[in-house]
UniProtKB/Swiss-Prot annotation:
Segments of this protein annotated with the region Disordered: 15-40
Its EC number(s): 3.2.2.27
Changes seen on gene knockout: Severe loss of unracil exision activity. Increased number of germ-cell corpses in response DNA damage induced by ionizing radiation.
A Pfam family assignment: UDG
Main location: mitochondrion
Function: Excises uracil residues from the DNA which can arise as a result of misincorporation of dUMP residues by DNA polymerase or due to deamination of cytosine.
Keyword check for Metal-binding: no
Keywords recorded for this protein, A-Z: DNA damage, DNA repair, Hydrolase, Mitochondrion, Nucleus
Temperature sensitivity of activity: Optimum temperature is 26 degrees Celsius.
Name recorded for this polypeptide: Uracil-DNA glycosylase
Organism: Caenorhabditis elegans
Homology family: Belongs to the uracil-DNA glycosylase (UDG) superfamily. UNG family.
One GO-annotated biological process of the protein: base-excision repair, AP site formation via deaminated base removal
One GO CC term on file: nucleus
């Protein structure tokens, strides 16, 4: 005779809860990217672990070439001070942009020997969901800030066939070799330049020097505005090309219009035997 076994309600409820949790976790897995749409490095970033509870900068720099080039830099005391400051911000309930895993986006996506152009910004955008580790760029779905709108306007007049995209994500430039570096890599939410004096510029000045000294091919540096112009002293101008213009901010837009820095950049790249940037590939 078969014997009926009754499973207690508490176990049935636990099993149902487990299934619901499993379904929820499945919904949170990032959607797969269609083949060919993004390179392997982008895919890795989309599938990376959740944001760390403690910020350790070296662990966030996953680009192999940059990890080697900056290995000694991460051993210096000022890096520990930056980490201490950032962790203090988080512990105080302050929001930091970009999220920790996106601080080094431009480093993690663009290997050192693939750099052909460097664009230097000042610090990340400080409003919600804007900054993601590329200077002047914002995430898709976020309205382009005024400076980026002016960049697009100049491109429309400078580059034949350029049509303003419906987003502000400049990842397409990074894929082509444009290293988009902010001098300061983090900012407190809604407070511009709030992290300008915590040590980041010591780090990014070192990065600029490394690019200048160790790049085997001429690099085009686009320096927009007085702040970026000061970085010229870090660059070997006998080896590399520096194009200085006004900043695309509305405050200096009159001098920005007509600068034609994008076509000039491509001319310099072609003169050195390198591929021009397809600025419309966004």
């Amino acid at each position: 005779m078969s014997k009926t076994v009754r499973i207690p309600d508490m176990f049935l409820k636990a099993s149902a809860a487990s299934k619901r949790k499993s379904a929820s976790n499945t919904e949170n897995i990032p959607e797969k990217v269609p083949a060919g749409n993004e390179n392997q490095e982008v895919k890795k970033m989309k599938l990376q672990a959740p944001e760390p509870t403690e910020i350790l900068l070296k662990s966030l720099l996953t680009g192999e070439s940059w990890s080697k080039l900056l290995e000694e830099e991460f051993k210096k005391g000022y890096i520990s001070k930056i980490e201490k400051f950032l962790n203090s911000e988080v512990n105080k309930g302050k929001q930091v942009f970009p999220p920790p895993t996106q601080i080094f986006t431009t480093f993690n996506l663009l290997p050192f020997d693939e750099i052909s152009v460097v664009i230097i910004g000042q610090d990340p955008y400080h409003d919600d969901n804007q900054a993601h580790g590329l200077s002047f760029s914002v995430q898709k779905g976020v309205k382009p800030p005024p400076s980026l709108k002016n960049i697009y306007k100049e491109l429309e007049s400078d580059i034949e066939g350029f049509k303003r995209p419906d987003h502000g994500n400049l990842l397409g430039w990074t894929r082509q070799g444009v290293f988009m570096l902010n001098a300061t890599l983090t900012v407190r939410a809604h407070e511009a330049n709030s992290h300008a004096k915590i040590g980041w510029q010591t780090f990014t000045d070192t990065v600029i020097r490394i690019i200048s000294r160790q790049s085997e091919k001429p690099i085009v540096f686009l320096l927009w505005g007085g702040f970026a112009h000061k970085k010229e002293e870090l660059i070997d101008t006998k080896k590399h090309v520096v194009i200085k213009t006004a900043h695309p901010s509305p405050l200096s837009a009159r001098k920005w219009w007509g600068c034609k820095c994008f076509s000039k950049c491509n001319t310099e790249l072609e003169n050195s035997g390198r591929n021009p940037i397809n600025w419309a590939d966004l």
